[in-house]
Amino acid sequence: MTDAGLRRLKIHIACCYNETYSKDNLPEWLTTDYLPYLKDEELDDISVDKMTLEDREAWTDNNIAKLLEIADKEIISSVAEKPISLLASVLEIKDALEQEEYITYLPIPIDGSNNGWQHLCAMSKDKEAGELVGIVPQDIQKDFYVQCAKDLIKRVPDWFEERQMPMKHIRKGIAKRGSMTRAYSAGAQKIAENMYLDCHVEGYLDKYNITEEDCELLAKHLIKAIDKVCAGPLQTMKFLQKIAEAEIASEYSKNIKQKSIRWTTPSGFPVIYEAFVENEFKEKAIISCSKRKVKPILTKEDGSKEETDTIRIQHVGKEPTDKPKIRSFMSGISPNFVHSMDASHMARVIAKWDGDFGAVHDSFSVHACDVDELLDLIKEEFITMYSYSNFFEVIERMIVTNPDNFNYNQPRLGSLDIREVKNSDYFFA
């Protein structure tokens, strides 16, 4: 176990436990003054995973006795955010501290900070949005969901004033999922459904008197808030939709009977995107039960029950046609393209990585002593992918089959220098 590996293990342990501190009771060992940050974000407390990397490491150092006790007694901690991962990690650090030479086998995960928005920011060179998703270096990691929540509150102040929801509950129940999925073109209806479900899971429906109608209202305003916070990325999504329109819905595309959108990702993966109109059909069938000793029981509309000799089945199915479904192309091009770029980034990283590697969606994992090396490679490949003066031209070359058929003006580029990500602690963390 190297010193760098031990540091990364300590950071991981701190995030697995993830203790929360009130702004009025911040510990003395902190190396950073979080009060201005908490005031600006309108938060009353801070969890360890929102602190600097130095303070995450310091948390483990200052709680080592408690952590070693968890290891000695093999405790599944009820107060830890990730109790199983915590136990595995403290068993690891116990052996590492006690043995002069120690080989670690535990995978240490590093997670992307809003990957979809990261790619959209890089395409549009949106520096302001890049500051919120870990592309631009920050002393303290900014919270993208809080920024969206703050703008949302300004749009419907009376609603939030009436309920007196603390920011951390607004972030978790109202803003988080919608802000995350909007990068993949989630609409107001889906955002409202997810918002209602999240509030139900967290117990906010009764606590703050939140209805489905409230979520429908908030979802519409949340989309406007996201548009304000992430202007560049949202324009990029609209640009991709215009390309889809030209490729599938234009007179030119209809004349040549174009039925798919195709591109090749930076990793060399060929994408064929298809979506077809489906015709609905119905089939009816009757199953005879006359020879069964125990007859099926049917419940009538009035609630009464009776035995039956037959069961009637009605199946509704869908069969695809060869007609392109324009609406699906329009709504799906942005998430499919962004996901393909995200997958391409991971593929390029894996292709150059010469060691053990694990991945779950946007979470990469390697052994503790290799984390810093992996982070360098992740940043290097991201920079390489987006080191173009105008990535909108790259997108057109990737997707547009006939430049004469596409005359939509490209969105205005921001001032982001993609090389800034090299010095960011929170691009993946």
Over which residues does each language-model region extend?
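Conserved catalytic core of nucleotide polymerization and phosphodiester-bond processing enzymes
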Residues: 1-429
